[in-house]
Amino acid sequence: MHHEAPLYTWFGLTFNLANVLMITVTSVIVFVIAVLATRNLAMKPTGMQNFLEWVMDFVKGIIKSNMDWKTGGRFHMLGMTLIMYIFVANMLGLPFSVVIDNKLWWKSPTADPVVTLTLATMVVALSHYYGIKLNGFKEYAKGFVSPMPILFPLKIIEEFANTLTLGLRLYGNIFAGEILLALLAGSLATGVGGTIAAIIPTIAWQGFSIFVGAIQAFIFTMLTMVYMAHKVSHDH
């Protein structure tokens, strides 16, 4: 069933209130996790601190697989933020959705292309910023005309393609998962027969969606570091 988005117009700008709500919820959850994991730091980590250090090591491995740590270390916190934020965002729409007056209020924020394309645009923009900051504008500009100046139009197209594929890949996977979960939930509500037939596929798809959400958070973070490495390396 199609549900409308709760929209609000302010000074000529239209805001999706569901996106605002879910982005805020995701940010608060990630912030709380970070605070709980670091409020009582110990030399021998346990519990939440142990989990956060594992995430840090995991992201460090992603960065080191793409660039020298001396250069890539500055992107450690960016990678940490992205992988945790996107994973939490991907999970929010799995347990349930909230619909009030046919308006969808509770969902995964990454099930909206506006959110994922905004994240992708931010990542690509940051890669250009650090490309100029670390290599200088002249060296940065060379990347668009090497090995041959005739490739310049293709390089520009590549930048737009990177933004679209990075954002739409995340959106497509999460949105498709929520659509299927909604269909299965509808089957659960059709009666005893529908409930029995749909309960096992629903549980199975919930588990698979957790896996997909984790993989998509990893892929987004990995591609972020690939784009960063491409711009900050001296031989790009």
From Swiss-Prot:
A GO BP entry is: proton motive force-driven plasma membrane ATP synthesis
Q: Which UniProt keywords apply?
A: ATP synthesis, Cell membrane, CF(0), Hydrogen ion transport, Ion transport, Membrane, Transmembrane, Transmembrane helix, Transport
Principal place of residence = membrane
Q: What protein family does this chain belong to?
A: Belongs to the ATPase A chain family.
Q: How does it assemble?
A: F-type ATPases have 2 components, CF(1) - the catalytic core - and CF(0) - the membrane proton channel. CF(1) has five subunits: alpha(3), beta(3), gamma(1), delta(1), epsilon(1). CF(0) has three main subunits: a(1), b(2) and c(9-12). The alpha and beta chains form an alternating ring which encloses part of the gamma chain. CF(1) is attached to CF(0) by a central stalk formed by the gamma and epsilon chains, while a peripheral stalk is formed by the delta and b chains.
**What exactly does this protein do?**
Key component of the proton channel; it plays a direct role in the translocation of protons across the membrane.
Indicate what this protein is called per its UniProt record: ATP synthase subunit a
Q: Which organism is it from?
A: Anoxybacillus flavithermus (strain DSM 21510 / WK1)
UniProt gene name: atpB
